[in-house]
Amino acid sequence: RALQKAANCSLGARIHVEKRIPVGAGMGGGSSDAAGVLVGLNRLWETGLTRAELEDVGLTLGADVPFCIRGGLTRTRGIGEAMQELPCGQCFPLVVIQPCGGLSTRDVFAAYHAQAVSFRPDNDAAQAALADGDLRALSPALGNVLQPVSEQMRPAIADAIADLRNCGAAASLMTGSGSAVFGAFETEQSADAAFAALKKRYDRVFRCETCMESVIEQI
């Protein structure tokens, strides 16, 4: 309906969304679904909205939707609407684990705001490391201010991050508000080996890689 209103369009559609991103994982599954539907309907209905216009519509649905429409690597400010596109030296092999049940984003943020959290990641250093494709330099610059809060709610998150590092991940962190965590590896072979080992310990383990394409380019 948001797209119908923005494009002054009365057409409809029967939509089936096959979800592959785990629910309650902090990976933007719902936001990416919304982005894909907006882009698909814009093409199906031939409404002709630009990417920027689709991002504006997406922002009315969720803070992460504009990024999911744009894709690639961005440095994001505000609630998600101010995006600076960044160069990336390479795509990284990943192993993603959802070690426990999902977390409520609202509950995590409520607990975060109730605490005094002074830690901040070094975004400038992370940006430089990503531009160089240097995972070893990236690792100490990474941080997720929500991670300590989510680990208190689900201690298995910290265990999974440790398991990824023990399996050779050059960088490992919680995604979003949790409960999923990822490990970035320097080679496909090391990621494959970690994936094989971790499948024996966890039910929900995924082998993937970073992607520099947007939803618009994939559909």
Model-derived segments and their meaning:
Residues 1-21, 156:
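Helix-rich "cap/lid" substructures immediately adjacent to catalytic or cofactor-binding pockets
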Residues 174-186:
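N-terminal pre-core extensions flanking Radical SAM catalytic domains
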